[in-house]
A protein has these predicted regions:
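Glycine-rich phosphate-binding loop signature in dinucleotide/nucleotide-binding domains
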Residues: 42-46, 124-129, 160-162, 321-323
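Phosphate/ribose-phosphate-bearing ligand recognition and processing surfaces
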Residues: 61, 86, 140, 144
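Gly/Ser-rich phosphate-binding catalytic loop and adjacent alpha/beta segment
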Residues: 65-128
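YjeF_N-associated NAD(P)HX repair module
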Residues: 2-5, 125-262
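Small-residue (G/A/S/T)-rich helix-start motifs and N-terminal tracts that mark the onset
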Residues: 1-83, 89-90, 94, 201-361, ...
Length: 402
């Protein structure tokens, strides 16, 4: 089974896909088609009554796509929209809603704007063979409330009567990051999750609601995860409220500098502050600590004895890392045996903390001595052409050096 991902990681991937030319509309089409394919691989859907219970978000959009594909295969398809069509939240979901609105012959649409007409859903579910949960997905927040909670109860009653329940991506009512039940949740027979399972699906708390877990490919390029893109930036941006205080917007730790280089870690710290971080803490040898401080009073310097990164520096860095949101390792460290051993030791110990790392400059060269240390890190590696060759043994063509 694929390892799980968080909601935030999936958001990053979606944004990066769009940047690479794989639009959200394409991803939605693939997701809905895969749901239909999963159903058709288990049932002969011709003349089966399939009720798709959708809400106004992107999970609803996936359901609209699935409805279209299932109708083309001869199923009796009913789409029940819980909510007002005018409040469908995204362009992609609205586009697919508009499509099924034109399919009046093959798809029956029912609109339940509020709890007062929940009888319409109950009637639609009464003789359903298959029910598709397209209500709430990764955007769920807090305990379910009416009319969604009432819809979930009716879906579970349909299951008790023998209907087969399929949840798209994650059963409605399950927290995608923790697996906790948010008051109540759909009890699915099959959950068709996109790209990779959301980590909540893999928890014991969610196991009796997930049913069979099927992970499907929706066309996410490898590059959307392998390389940093706009999504990796957007996910870090927070609304800056008037009530915010120091530390709310990031504490960045820079481990760099040596007797030879004092400017590189200072510039990294200034760049962190310029990018919006609240605090930039630099762990550096004592011999250059005052030089770094001279760049700006906003830089916090933690110093250790020695001229290059050593065991004392690693110990200090690990202590500072406990409170850091992200850690930059490398600028100005120099490339010496003592530094290489210290860098490898530091990264190895940070791997188990799940801290976000940036491996830069001389730290990249150090990692070339033992590339296994980079396995399973959460981070970004920032080589220029020369460092890329040292790390991988691959020489980039001249036109790609920049």
């Amino acid at each position: 089974m694929n390892s799980g991902i968080t909601v935030e990681e999936m958001f990053t991937i979606d944004v990066n896909c769009d940047y690479l030319g794989v639009s959200r509309l394409m991803l939605m089409e693939n997701a809905g088609a895969e749901v239909a394919r999963a159903i058709c691989s288990r049932f002969d859907v011709k003349d089966k009554r399939i009720v798709i219970v959708a809400h106004t978000g992107n999970k609803g959009g996936d359901g609209f796509v699935a409805a279209r594909h299932l109708a083309l295969l001869g199923a009796e398809v009913i789409v029940v929209l819980i909510g007002d069509p005018s409040k469908i939240r995204t362009f992609e979901a609205k586009r697919n809603w508009d499509v099924i609105c034109e399919m009046e012959y093959s798809i029956n649409r029912i609109i339940v704007k509020d709890s007062l007409r929940m009888d319409l859903l109950a009637k639609a579910l009464d003789k359903a063979d298959i029910v598709v949960d397209a209500l709430l997905g990764t955007g769920v927040r807090g305990t379910l409330r009416p009319p969604i909670s009432e819809a979930v109860k009716l879906i579970n009653k349909a299951k008790d009567r023998g209907a087969f329940i399929v949840s798209i991506d994650i059963p409605t009512g399950i927290s995608p990051n923790t697996g906790e039940v948010l008051g109540l949740a759909v009890k699915a027979d099959l959950t068709v999750t996109h790209h990779k399972p959301k980590i909540g699906l893999l928890s014991n708390k969610a196991s009796k609601y997930v049913g069979e877990l099927l992970t499907v490919n929706i066309g996410v390029p490898v590059e959307a995860e392998l390389f940093a893109g706009p999504g990796d930036v957007l996910i870090t941006m927070k609304e800056r409220k008037l009530t915010a205080h120091k530390g709310d917007f990031g504490r960045i730790l820079i481990i760099g500098g040596s007797k030879d280089y004092s400017g590189a870690p200072a510039l990294a710290g200034l760049a962190a502050l310029r990018s919006g971080a609240d605090l930039a803490i630099i762990v550096a040898p004592k011999v250059i600590s005052n030089a770094i401080r001279s760049y700006s009073p906003n830089l916090i310097v933690r110093e250790y004895d020695g001229e290059y990164l050593n065991d004392k520096g690693v110990e200090l860095a690990l202590n500072e890392a406990e409170r850091a949101d992200a850690i930059i390792i490398g600028p100005g460290l120099s490339f010496r045996d003592e530094v290489v051993n210290s860098v490898l030791n530091l990264i190895d110990k940070l791997r188990s903390t799940n801290k976000k790392l940036v491996i830069d400059a001389d730290a990249i060269k150090a990692c070339s001595k033992d590339k296994n240390v980079l396995r399973d890190i959460i981070g970004v590696i920032t080589p220029h052409a020369g460092e890329f060759k040292i790390l991988t043994g691959i020489k980039l063509p001249n036109e790609e050096k920049n």
